[in-house]
A protein has these predicted regions:
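Alpha-helical coiled-coil scaffolding segments
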Residues: 1-169
């Protein structure tokens, strides 16, 4: 959003910290492991999945790829069906931000139904606004979802590693 003013004071410190957290996860390879897992899971669904047309090498391209919530909902529906749970509903053709926000909200509700704790979910704006700091919340959600899937012996397994950081700020 080009009309957004720059953060100052406490807001700036929070944004800086979230961006640093994302950078740390990126250095660990977490976003790459997440997108690899998503593609493997979706490709395992009888070949109905079209791989992304571009390399998802940076946070912005990954965020844009997931932005409308369609890929997230399709991905989650595969997890839910293998766990004998109801699929989430979503709009396949997103023509406005309201449909995207609804998709993202349905994804979060589906994650809770799958067994992910509510505190690991993210706000729809974290994904929709395509900003690096808030995108960390999306990565954290998907990373945690991977561990929930692993605890249910879902195949293909998520290869992410548990990382523990001491927050000193």
């Amino acid at each position: 959003m080009s009309l957004r003013s720059n953060k100052a004071g406490f807001g700036y410190e929070v944004q800086r910290k979230m961006e640093a957290n994302y950078d740390r996860e990126e250095a660990q390879g977490t976003p790459r492991q997440i997108i690899t897992w998503i593609i493997e899971v979706m490709a395992s669904d009888d070949g109905k999945f079209e791989k992304p047309t571009e390399e998802l090498l940076d946070w912005k391209s990954l965020c844009t790829y997931l932005r409308d919530g369609v890929v997230l909902c399709k991905f989650l529906n595969i997890l839910l069906l293998k766990d004998n749970k109801s699929k989430v509903t979503f709009s396949k053709k997103v023509s406005n931000s309201f449909a995207a926000m609804t998709n993202i909200e349905n994804f979060n509700k589906g994650c809770e139904a799958y067994g992910l704790a509510r505190e690991f979910s993210f706000q729809s704006g974290d994904l929709w606004e395509v900003r690096k700091g808030p995108f960390y919340n999306v990565i954290n959600c998907l990373h945690s979802l991977g561990f929930v899937a692993n605890s249910k012996a879902f195949i293909p397994a998520y290869a992410g590693e548990v990382t523990k950081y001491m927050d000193r700020d």
